[in-house]
């Protein structure tokens, strides 16, 4: 078929190609209809009709035949023809409204909740949920999920607490084997130090370190790292204090594993004449107090409102329940001036540290007449470790605490401390320490919970000289996000916290800084399969 339009736009001729149809001529008066308008109309229809056909086919496939009215068809076709968006935004607004309505409704008792998304979809289909019922079930599922997650987190913290308080099998084996060696091997019982070095133990020309611990492996790392990192190892004297049950094993280790040219002395608490009940009555009271025993050895969850406690707060409370905090070994640092009456200046080290830098310059630090050289713990990049002020350790709702302490005062750290014993002996630090321990016992431990640092923060008030933070980096036992570059630069790194490097819960990427000083070639270490 051919379409012919005359140049004057006054006639249109349609003829068939096979000439079976006669020529058709259409003549239209120009005054009634514009031929140009007619041409444009036909042209537009030629473009639109294919799209209308395609759209109709699509709508048919989507089920337009199910519509029972022209209005239904209009709702389906109208937005497509007019370019309007679908109803998803309106549906979302309606669903938000329903969610707000059910957020304050009480969830019915005995409501059976799906265990998975697929089960939820199946229940919706089988039970013909309306939107409100679906929203209520969804809310109940989310609340149950949050409770389960919270309970799992607290269970994890409890398990971590018990793991941190336990003695690893390898370390227990090491202690037993070395104790047996002490009884059967005369060399393991040799005098420490040798008789010719006994005068050095009270010679203030040497650099005296004090370490109080019942962990033989940890003690070996502290001593080895300090000696290997020192520019003057021949000036180092270590005074190691341990309890009676560990004394034989500790003595055996250092008798059989020399750290020459450094000198090591091992003493048990039972060998100090000064440590009598008359001199430390408050510690006996602490150990025998029923409230203390229940607090440290009782049910760690009883009385704790877990719904109002954050995991971080719960973790801190668990750490404060470590049995080591009522151990005499942990309180011994407050008696250093009496235990070492001939020494003028010492550095006290915890057993969970590693010495990476030369500590010789510490003996040249001027404490300005103060007793205790320590790093602050309220300034630094680490918000978890370096954000400690007195409010983090004390209960300021207690009138005595509120009266004597400032909650915003910066705290300082134990772990690596320089003690001027001459200045210390002129103070009443020990008496103040005992006095506040008694007050806390009277208050049934309501003034503070966390170990030996709180009474020390009070007792040393006004006697602390702040040293540069590069000397002592804390927190390697708290979190895995510790900055590795800062770890490498620190003179002393401190694994304070539950994740000790000798435990399986220790952080793998931080452990090598500690294991570097473990002598894995030692027969006792190998036979006890330490950290294997």
Curated annotation (Swiss-Prot):
GO cellular component, one term: pollen tube
EC number(s) on file: 2.4.1.-
Pathway where it operates: Glycan metabolism; pectin biosynthesis
Gene Ontology BP, a term: pollen tube growth
Lumenal side: 62-532
Keywords: Cell wall biogenesis/degradation, Glycoprotein, Glycosyltransferase, Golgi apparatus, Membrane, Signal-anchor, Transferase, Transmembrane, Transmembrane helix
InterPro entries referenced in this protein's UniProt entry, alphabetically: GAUT, Glyco_trans_8, Nucleotide-diphossugar_trans
Protein name: Probable galacturonosyltransferase 14
Species this chain originates from: Arabidopsis thaliana (Mouse-ear cress)
Taxonomic lineage of the native organism: Eukaryota, Viridiplantae, Streptophyta, Embryophyta, Tracheophyta
């Amino acid at each position: 078929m051919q379409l012919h339009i005359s140049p004057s736009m006054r006639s249109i001729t349609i003829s068939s190609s096979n000439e079976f149809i006669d020529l058709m001529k259409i003549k239209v008066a120009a005054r009634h209809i514009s031929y140009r308008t007619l041409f444009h109309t036909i042209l537009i229809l030629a473009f639109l009709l294919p799209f209308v056909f395609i759209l109709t086919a699509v709508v048919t496939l989507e089920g337009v035949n199910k519509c029972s009215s022209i209005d239904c068809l209009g709702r389906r076709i109208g937005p497509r023809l007019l370019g309007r968006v679908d109803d998803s935004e309106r549906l979302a607004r309606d669903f938000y409204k329903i969610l707000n309505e059910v957020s304050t409704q009480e969830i019915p008792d005995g409501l059976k909740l799906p265990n998975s998304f697929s089960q939820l979809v199946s229940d919706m289909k089988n039970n013909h949920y309306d939107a409100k019922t679906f929203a209520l079930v969804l809310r109940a599922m989310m609340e149950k999920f949050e409770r389960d997650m919270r309970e799992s987190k607290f269970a994890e913290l409890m398990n971590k607490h018990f793991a941190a308080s336990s003695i690893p099998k390898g370390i227990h084996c090491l202690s037993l084997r070395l104790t047996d060696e002490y009884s059967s091997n005369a060399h393991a019982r040799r005098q420490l130090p040798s008789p010719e070095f006994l005068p050095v133990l009270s010679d203030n020309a040497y650099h005296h370190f004090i370490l109080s611990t019942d962990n033989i492996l940890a003690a070996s790392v502290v001593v080895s790292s300090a000696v290997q990192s020192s520019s003057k190892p021949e000036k180092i004297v270590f005074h190691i204090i341990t309890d009676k049950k560990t004394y034989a094993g500790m003595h055996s280790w250092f008798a059989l594993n020399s750290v020459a040219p450094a000198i090591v002395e091992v003493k048990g608490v039972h060998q100090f004449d000064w440590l009598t009940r008359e001199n430390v009555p408050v510690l006996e009271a602490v150990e025998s107090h029923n409230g203390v025993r229940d607090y440290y050895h009782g049910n760690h969850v009883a009385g704790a409102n877990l719904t109002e406690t954050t995991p971080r707060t719960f973790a801190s409370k668990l750490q404060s329940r470590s049995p080591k905090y009522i151990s005499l070994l942990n309180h011994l640092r407050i008696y250093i001036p009496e235990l070492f009456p001939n020494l003028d200046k010492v550095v006290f080290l915890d057993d969970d540290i590693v010495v990476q830098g030369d500590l010789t310059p510490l003996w040249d630090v001027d404490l300005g007449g103060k007793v205790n050289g320590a790093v602050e713990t309220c300034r630094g990049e680490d918000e978890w470790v370096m954000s400690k002020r007195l409010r983090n350790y004390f209960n300021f709702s207690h009138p005595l605490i509120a009266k004597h302490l400032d909650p915003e005062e910066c705290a300082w750290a134990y772990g690596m401390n320089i003690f001027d014993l001459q200045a210390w002996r002129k103070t009443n630090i020990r008496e103040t320490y005992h006095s506040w321990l008694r007050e806390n016992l009277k208050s049934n431990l309501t003034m503070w919970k966390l170990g030996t640092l709180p009474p020390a923060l009070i007792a040393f008030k006004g006697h602390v000289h702040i040293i540069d933070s590069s000397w002592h980096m804390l927190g390697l036992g708290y979190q895995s996000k510790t900055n590795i570059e800062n770890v490498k630069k620190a003179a002393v790194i401190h694994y304070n916290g539950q994740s000790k490097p000798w435990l399986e819960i220790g952080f793998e990427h931080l452990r090598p800084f500690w294991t570097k000083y473990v002598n894995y070639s030692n027969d006792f270490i190998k036979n006890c399969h330490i950290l294997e």
